Every structure is written in C-alpha cells, then in structure tokens.
Amino acid sequence: MPKYKHVEDILKIMRNVEQVRNIGIIAHVDHGKTTTSDALLAHAGILSPKLAGEARALDYLDVEQQRGITVKAANVSLYHEYKGKPYVINLIDTPGHVDFSGKVTRSLRVLDGAILVVDAVEGVMTQTETVLRQALEELVRPLLFINKVDRLIKELKLSPQEIQQRIVQIIKDVNERILTFAPDPEIAKKWLLDPAKGHVALGSAKDKWGITIPMAQEKGIKFSDIVEAYAKGSKDAIEELFHKAPLHETLLDMVVRWVPNPREAQKYRVPRLWKGDINSELGKAMLNCDPEGPLVVFINDMRLDPHTKRLVATGRVWAGTATAGKEVWLVNAQKPGKILQVSIYMGPDREIVDYVTAGNIVAMLGLDDARAGETLVDINYKDQAAPFEQLHYVSEPVVTVAIEPKNPRDLPKLIEALRTLSIEDPNLKVTINQETGEYLLSGMGMLHIEIALTQLKEVYGLEVKVSPPVITYRETVRKPGEKVEGKSPNKHNKLYITVEPLEKEVIEMIQKGEITDDQDPRERAKVLRDKVNWDADTARRIWAVDEENFNIFIDKTVGVQHLREVKDTILAGWRLAMKEGPLAKEPVRGVKVILWDAVIHEDPAHRGPAQLYPAVRNAVYASMLTDSPTLLEPWQKLDIRVPNEYIGAVTGVITKHRGKILEVIDMGGQARIVAAVPIAESFELPMELRSVTAGRAFWGTEFYGWEPVPDQLLPELIRKIRERKGLPPEPPKAEDFLGP
C-alpha cells in the first residue's frame, strides 16, 4: 500500500468543511488507545494493515515505543468514505498517562469529538473520568468504544448474559459522568450515549474488529458468534470477524455520523471558549467557520522538528485560510509574527501544502515566539483580537530535580535543549537557582521528568547528572494576619497590609478561569458577589489576580496621594513576594493581600522599585508570620483495582504512607479502592503495592490537590528545605521584616 495515498484528495476535501471531522481518542493509560489509532491509520493508507497494532505509528518518539505509552500528541489526516462520500478525519492522538494531562487538555481544544476507549475488564477508571470531564468542559462530543471484549470471554470466561451486563454497566457509568460534567444540561441530554443509535462500539483493537448495534443488524453478526469464535480460540473465525466488521470502518462511520463538522461545532464552542466579541467580524467568521474570513488559529502544540531543528506550531484554523507569508498577531505574546510555511501532518511527517482552510489542523513554521495556548489572528484585525480562554491544566509541576551536564563544555547545549523542551511541553518548568547556578527541572510526576531526561539523552545526545527528586511545596496562612507597616529603605514610603486566607471557592474559580487578571473589573466583581457573596466594594477593589498561584491583591485605601502612579510598582513587588514566601522561599498559594493605607513620597526619584519592592515584601512577609503560616504539600489520588483478598494489605500500605482511603467499592470479586497520598510518600508506593498484592493490583494516579503539612512534621520540613536552599535553618520571625 503506498505510504501517502491521498494527500491531493485530502486537500481537496478539506476545503469543504461539511466533509471534515476533528477527533481524538481519549482513554485511561493502557486501555488500548494507541492500538485503536493504529487500526485507523492502517486504513488511511499510512501504515500497512499487517503492522497495525504492533507498529504504534503515532508513538513516534523512541521513548514511547520503549515504554509502550503515548507521550506526544501527534496528529494525522485520514481519508474515509461513508455512504459513497469522501471525508477527511483529522485524528489527534492524546496521551493517556496522568503525567501528561496538560497535553491532553491542549489537544482537546482543537477537537470537536472524541472516541473514549474503555477496557471492558477494568471499566471506567480515574483517568477515564478525568479525560472525559476535560473533553466535556471543552465541549467535545464523546462517543464510546468498549475495547478488549475478547478478555471478557477468554480471561474472565463470562457468559453472553454476563458480558451484556458488564457492557450495560460501562455505558451507564459513562452516561452518568456526561450528565455530571457537561457544562450545559441541553448538551448533556443530546450527547447521552444510545447504543441502539450507534453511539457505542464494542470490539478488540488488537484483533482489529468492532461492531455497533445498527451495523451488527445490517451485517447479520450475532454476539453469540463472537463469543464462540473466542471460546474456541479459532484464528480463522477471528480473522473472519475482522473482514466482516473491520474496526476502522465501524469507528470512522460512527465519527462521520455523530461527530459534528467544524462549522456545526464552532457555533456552540466559540461563544464558550473564545473571549472576544461574538458580533465582531472575527467573531462572526469563527461562528461560521468561514475560510474567506480573517485568519484565526489556536495553537495547541509547539514541537522541534527532528529533521530541520525548527519549531513547528500546530493548531486549528477557526476562521480564514493559513498560507505561507501571512502576517499575524500573537495575542498572548502581544507580538507580530509571520507564517513561513504551512503543512498538514501524516503521522510524524509533515506534507508541505499551499494553504489550509478553516476547520482543519495546520502545522506552521516561522512562529518561534508562539507557545501552546497562543491565539494567532490576521495582523489587520489585532484590535478585535482576543485570546481563547487560558487553558486549564489539571495538575501543576510538583516534583523537581537539579540537572547538570556530565561534561561542563555541554552547558550551552543543555540550556538550549531545556529551553526547547519547556516550549514543547509547558508543564515542564525550567528555572535557574540564582544562588547555586543549578538548572532545576520541575514536572507533574517522576515519569514526566524521566521522559524529559531520556529526551535530553536520545534527542540531544546529552549525558546529565541528576539530583534526587525534590517535592515542591506552597506557603499559605491559616488565619488572617495582623495589619503591619512595611517601610521602604529610605523610610519615605509606608504601606499598611494584611494577609488573609483566600476562600477555597475563589481559588477554584481562578483555576477554572471564571476569575482572571485581565477580566473587566465590573464583571469580576459581579461573579464574586453572586457566587461567593463578596461585598460589592471589596470585589470592585481587586487590583490583580495571580493566576499561577491563586492569590489576589485588594486595594482598600481611601484618598492616598500618588498611589495610582505607583500601582504597577507595588503589584510587581507583590508578585515577587508571591513567588517566594517567608517560611522557606516556596511559592505562596491561596492568599488575599489587602492594602489598607499608604504614604507615598511625592518625588518619583524616592519611590522607585528599589524602595517599593522591599516595602511590599516586608509587609506581606511580616503579616504572614504573625499568625500560623504553614506549608501545603501536593497529594496524589490513587485508583486501585485489586482482588478482594488484598483489600487489607493495600489499605495498610496506604495508611503507612500518611494516606487516606476515600472509598472502597465492591465490583464482584474485585475491589476498587480510591485513596490519596502525599506525593512525598509516593516514590516507594508502586514497589510496595506490587509486593503486597503479588503483582495483582492495577492502579492509576492523578493530582489530588494541596493539603496542609501536619504540624508535627512542619518545623523539621521547613528546616530541611531551608538548608537545601542554603538559607539559615531557622525561619525568620515577623519582627525581622518590621525594621526600626
């Protein structure tokens, strides 16, 4: 089969948006997502059908091939005929492992529909729920593929009736979550899965067959025939199944029939996902997915091309047509840019083309200043430009290692490699410890960091030394602190500040993007008044929102002279104080900083950053230290499946590691244990769980949240962090910041 059978055909169809579908395949790790993708790719003439299932075509990083899990979200355009009509299906592969959920979120923004793959034996797991919730929040329509049905017959030896019960239960579980997570009850009702209509497929991605109820009726396939084929272990009968009901045909037919085309989808997705004026020319062009309108592209992926060593920006064209030479405005970066080349993806390779029209996925060269999450618009429309909402990732980087090259001469190469890695994956944070000069790499878990380290070795040829992993903590306050006076070094400026805990509901609203730094202040005040009963005056007086660490600055002063002129300087000082708290120089999280009064010198020479930064910092630190400051530590949620006889052993391991059991669910012979443990205690867990369950526990993990460190562990932990950072072991007291 020729490798690129259909590039010209694909381009022709892409122009007609009714014949385009943008889909992804989402799942819990190891439920068969990549194998399902391969079955689709074989059909598109990109892989030979014999290799599908073994080849893992979308996993084109060597790391992924070795670990057998998908890390980079790749994209490919497929060609499919349904009822005699040709369609282009843009398939975006999304990682299923929890450490990469940032990439999943970015991929979802460019999709209109998703095939949710669920393992028939394991059912709906934590990560299944997480990716489904993210898809629904991004208004991506889910369809269901229940994979590994052969395991129910071969391994669990279930009767046809028991298999039916298991399948009905999985559909019910998914539907319950659609009702819970869909942002709009109308959409939830419309998107509920109805197997009789063909919203659900069953099959085996490994054996490459799949059926829906309408298709089985049409082709005369009985479920009892499938059970018999596997029960007998008949290779011919299974091969026959593949010929009668090939998985690619079943899934792609389902996609064409039930996933909305880009124009239909943009009508309800744009108003919810884009922050601009829907009635502007840009807004109308996006609502109508108009290829003749001004260009708007949302970038979901930045990646280094291994051949050209240039950065490739991949994204979805929401309006207009992307062409080489097009001048654009980068809305978040607030910079102009120029597209030098446009192409479409065929697996890891890009095919250069003249143009890509609205509703399709494009890869572009030349936009080195862009980052994942950037919005590009035609430069002539920059006044109407607004970003798509900030993407909300589910986790935050919480594990850090220090790295240095084994050969000191490689340092410039390491710096460049780290810069590129952090562009490709915004969930990897690279920082330099100013005191020690170390390069610090932070990620969402040890697996996330290990993969980055492997890439340093394999892609960049770097040998590096790595420190043991360090957990990132956050500083916060438990009760409102006292009002304190912060003086500038020249004593001419005084700020009167208190620090209080920020309500949990407000932190969640910042996380979800309901409250942002650049929001219209009146709109923000209304949201806070209506949803969390803030009084109107306080809500209107918010000066800034720290979206990274969830803090708010409020100005409650009355009639202070010269305050407006130094507002930006005060806020810059506040942001610096939020980056490193007083206890252990860890970021400050979840606090309200209130400015009650101020004395500002009239001469600008006496009120610059060198004077005001220390005044803000000293006041914030002193107020935090007056009343019960503490550290928050990151926790991980575990979703464990285990035979019933091991429940006691598993709960024992969890509690030994300061964990808590959230629920235990009986699943008939198997138990599902949902638990949470501090990440600091999680490094040994996999080995211990395997040993106490004789290797029979499966589990998934995801970020659980931040919890206060127990008081009895706090002093020792603060001392350790301070010593590691080269600080005096004892934390400062409030009076240390209140100078004479």
Curated annotation (Swiss-Prot):
Keywords: Cytoplasm, Elongation factor, GTP-binding, Nucleotide-binding, Protein biosynthesis. The keyword Coiled coil does not apply. Pfam families: EFG_C, EFG_III, EFG_IV, GTP_EFTU, GTP_EFTU_D2. It is found in: Cytoplasm. GO terms for molecular function: GTP binding; GTPase activity; translation elongation factor activity. It comes from the Archaea. GTP binds at residues 27-34, 93-97, 147-150. Residues 18-263 form the tr-type G domain. Gene3D superfamilies: 3.30.230.10, 3.30.70.240, Elongation Factor G (Translational Gtpase), domain 3, P-loop containing nucleotide triphosphate hydrolases, Translation factors. The modification Diphthamide is found at residue 606. GO terms for cellular component: cytosol; ribonucleoprotein complex. Catalyzes the GTP-dependent ribosomal translocation step during translation elongation. During this step, the ribosome changes from the pre-translocational (PRE) to the post-translocational (POST) state as the newly formed A-site-bound peptidyl-tRNA and P-site-bound deacylated tRNA move to the P and E sites, respectively. Catalyzes the coordinated movement of the two tRNA molecules, the mRNA and conformational changes in the ribosome. Belongs to the TRAFAC class translation factor GTPase superfamily. Classic translation factor GTPase family. EF-G/EF-2 subfamily. This is Elongation factor 2. The lineage of its organism: Archaea, Thermoproteota, Thermoprotei, Desulfurococcales, Desulfurococcaceae.
